[in-house]
Design a protein with these regions (language model features):
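Charged, low-complexity surface segments at secondary-structure and domain boundaries
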Residues: 1-3, 138-139
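Conserved P-loop NTPase mechanochemical-coupling segment
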Residues: 155
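Alpha-helix N-cap/loop-to-helix initiation residues
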Residues: 6, 36, 58-61
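ATP-binding pocket architecture of kinase catalytic cores
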Residues: 41-148, 152
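Alpha-helical interaction segments
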Residues: 5-6, 29-32, 142-144
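ATP-binding glycine-rich phosphate-binding loop
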Residues: 23-41
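Juxta-kinase regulatory segment immediately upstream of eukaryotic protein kinase catalytic domains
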Residues: 2-26
Length: 155
């Protein structure tokens, strides 16, 4: 799915991490990708961990991603903190939210609370109106967009 070639992109990413953050010892562990051309890695260091996102600049609008993340944070929506980025190269360093999944926490005692909280956040996202760079509009999630997204499963 991704347009990134790991051997081509990981070397510049490692250089960016070393030069930007004075890292000498670290490991990049691949994380499960989402349904986009982005790739995620856990950056494991002696001092802890962060998440690194690779976003092909020709496929992903990183400026919009940053604007939406900032707006979500202002609205109190819990998202990873953006620690650093290089838009031209498609690199982003994010805080690490860990591995906890709702699926692992769901049981008869937690189901009502977890789903109530999830629906509350979905509502917050729906009413959020982020300001994108250059006043560009958010993509509409209409039938055409849904068909495009579903077509990704065929790839």
């Amino acid at each position: 799915m991704s347009t990134f070639d790991n051997t081509t992109q990981l070397a510049p990413l490692k250089t960016w991490l070393k030069e930007s953050f004075a890292l000498t010892r670290f490991e990049l562990q691949p994380l499960v990708n989402d349904a986009s051309s982005r790739q995620y890695f856990r950056l494991q260091m002696d001092s802890g961990s962060h998440v690194v996102m690779l976003a092909p600049p020709d496929k992903e609008n990183m400026a919009a991603f940053i604007a939406i993340a900032k707006d979500f944070a202002r609205q109190g929506i819990y998202t990873p903190e953006i620690l650093a980025y290089n838009i031209e190269k498609g690199f982003m360093l994010l805080s690490d939210l860990g591995n906890d999944l709702y699926l692992n926490l769901l049981n008869a005692n937690t189901v009502d609370d977890l789903y109530t909280r999830a629906l509350s956040v979905i509502h917050q996202i729906q009413v959020c109106n982020p300001k994108l760079p250059n006043d560009q509009p958010l993509d509409l999630f209409n039938e055409q967009h849904i068909r495009f997204e579903l077509g990704l499963f065929i790839d």
